Amino acid sequence: MNLEALCKEAGLSFYDDELVSENGKKIYRVYVQKEGGVKLDDCARLSEILSPIFDVEPPVSGEYFLEVSSCGLERKLSKIEHFAKSINELVKITTSEKEKIEAKIVSVDDENITLENLKTQEKTTLKFSDIRKARTFVEW
């Protein structure tokens, strides 16, 4: 099963997926993006495409609930592609050394992310492998 192709069929871009447990129930979440924003109808359409396929080829074992959602303005960045699609956005990063950074993503290559410090405008480059946790954020 190719989630990226199925999302494309619904006019969406696959962003990420995850399996979580909430209140003792398994939830399989599929996060999507779309130029101009994801609407509720987009999520419903993709859910209608995925449900019969997942009935035959479940993405996880056992009973679960399927959720289709926009990845949101403030979203987790866990793949190098996520950083590449987020150039010029603000990000909060925790490094493997537990250093906390708030910066703007300036550029991304195969292994590195270049950031601009929000306070000093100083540029720094981090190895993707040194990033423990990252999330975009919006200043209101």
From Swiss-Prot:
Pfam families referenced in this protein's UniProt entry, alphabetically: DUF150_C (PF17384), RimP_N (PF02576)
CDD domains, per the entry: YlxS_C
Classification via InterPro entries: Ribosome_maturation_RimP, RimP_C, RimP_C_sf, RimP_N, RimP_N_sf
Keyword set includes rRNA-binding: no
Record's keyword annotation contains Calcium: no
A GO cellular component entry from the record: cytosol
Subcellular location: Cytoplasm
One GO BP annotation of this record: ribosomal small subunit assembly
Annotated keywords: Cytoplasm, Ribosome biogenesis
Primary role: Required for maturation of 30S ribosomal subunits.
Family: Belongs to the RimP family.
UniProt-recorded name of the protein: Ribosome maturation factor RimP
Lineage, highest ranks first: Bacteria, Pseudomonadati, Campylobacterota, Epsilonproteobacteria, Campylobacterales
Gene: rimP
